[in-house]
Curated annotation (Swiss-Prot):
Subunit: Core component of the complement C1 complex, a calcium-dependent complex composed of 1 molecule of the C1Q subcomplex, 2 molecules of C1R and 2 molecules of C1S. The C1Q subcomplex is composed 18 subunits: 3 chains of C1QA, C1QB, and C1QC trimerize to form 6 collagen-like triple helices connected to six globular ligand-recognition modules (C1q domain). Interacts with CR1 (via Sushi 24 and Sushi 25 domains). Interacts (via C-terminus) with CD33; this interaction activates CD33 inhibitory motifs.
Domain Collagen-like: 31-109
Species, as recorded: Rattus norvegicus
Protein name: Complement C1q subcomponent subunit A
Region (Disordered): 35-111
Domain topic, free-text comment: The C1q domain is the ligand-recognition domain, which specifically recognizes and binds the Fc regions of IgG or IgM immunoglobulins.
Gene of this entry: C1qa
Length: 245
């Protein structure tokens, strides 16, 4: 320690001496820089700088984290537009049988239509090939027209028609029916008579008729001679069996 202090004192004296001598002589030109001194001690920490600009995004991202817990349900949204109708589904199974209905009131046969007629030939008019039965015996609800020989249906349903006609000759008759706008239908009956005796030709049928349909008896022009007298009568009858549903 004492050696260092002595060395420092010697240096100070030498510098002073040189300075004094230098004042007495002419100034010499500047010399070259000396050797760099020993680095000084670190200074005190400076003040905190301002915040820098955000850096560019990194090239690689981190590992994807685990799925988080489900959040709370949001409020209901507004109703959407009505969609197009879907395709028709398959036919469902039959449902159980319903309960038995209440028994209805008893029907009154007096309130039901009961068309029926019977007519015989007495003094019939000539009406082509139509066989006219001019004398009416029964004509319930007036379905039979004795001037034309036609039955006109007013109550749709199933009817029975029959005839018994007297003749001494060969005879062919038909029960003819006709619907409005439809071709007529006929059902023929024939009988031969070689002895010239009274003989009955009979026929009958059941027909389903609609309102406005007509039924009559028609003769064959070549075999249509009917007995006309007081000894026997020819008759044409018909009636409703039951109405259509």
């Amino acid at each position: 320690m004492e050696t260092s202090q002595g060395w420092l004192v010697a240096c100070v004296l030498a510098v002073t001496l040189v300075w004094t001598v230098a004042e007495d002589v002419c100034r010499a030109p500047n010399g070259k820089d000396g050797v760099a001194g020993i680095p000084g001690r670190p200074g005190r920490p400076g003040l905190k700088g301002e915040r820098g600009e955000p850096g560019a995004a990194g090239i690689r991202t981190g590992i994807r984290g685990l799925k988080g817990d489900m959040g709370e349900s949001g409020p209901p949204g507004k109703p959407g537009n009505v969609g197009f109708p879907g395709p028709t589904g398959p036919l469902g199974n039959s449902g159980p049988q319903g309960l038995k209905g209440v028994k209805g009131n008893p029907g009154n046969i007096r309130d039901q239509p009961r068309p029926a007629f019977s007519a015989i030939r007495q003094n019939p008019p000539t009406y082509g090939n139509v066989v006219v039965f001019d004398k009416v015996l029964t004509n319930q609800e007036n379905p039979y027209q004795n001037r034309t020989g036609h039955f006109i249906c007013a109550v749709p349903g199933f009817y029975y028609f029959t005839f018994q006609v007297i003749s001494k000759w060969d005879l062919c008759l038909s029960i003819v029916s006709s619907s409005r706008g439809q071709p007529r239908n006929s059902l023929g009956f024939c009988d031969t008579n070689s002895k010239g005796l009274f003989q009955v030709l009979a026929g009958g049928t059941v027909l389903q008729l609609q309102r406005g349909d007509e039924v009559w008896i028609e003769k064959d022009p070549a075999k249509g001679r009917i007995y006309q007298g007081t000894e026997a009568d020819s008759i044409f009858s018909g009636f409703l069996i039951f109405p259509s549903a």
